[in-house]
């Protein structure tokens, strides 16, 4: 018998729903998967992002990613629940060859640390600067 396939479901929620409701959606869809005897490997909230084009008159959306392992029948159940939800504006499920490594979410703190790093100043003077100093001494 072959190995159980891996799946990754990415869905976009309306941008105007509160964070508590986003968490309840994540728990709801994880529970649907667990009820159909599927192992939820990872769930990540990717945050609010601008959409490439408007979807249902929304220019932004809250991205959520679910990685799961199962027999494939759970995908239809999960996607049906998402299709019936008014809060989900788009979803997609992709079959993976194996478990994907969990990407580390980038935080604003990491970005500010990168910006704060300044190049060291070169204390030696270039020949052009030395000539200017000599001219000013005369």
Curated annotation (Swiss-Prot):
Coiled coil: none annotated. Residues 94-138 are annotated as: Disordered. It comes from the Bacteria. Keywords: Ribonucleoprotein, Ribosomal protein, RNA-binding, rRNA-binding. InterPro entries: Ribosomal_bS6, Ribosomal_bS6_CS, Ribosomal_bS6_sf, Ribosomal_S6_plastid/chlpt, Transl_elong_EF1B/ribsomal_bS6. Residues 106-138 have a biased composition (Basic and acidic residues). Pfam families: Ribosomal_S6 (PF01250). One of its GO terms (cellular component) is ribonucleoprotein complex. GO terms for molecular function: small ribosomal subunit rRNA binding; structural constituent of ribosome. HAMAP family: Ribosomal_bS6. Binds together with bS18 to 16S ribosomal RNA. NCBIfam families: S6. This is Small ribosomal subunit protein bS6. The gene is rpsF.
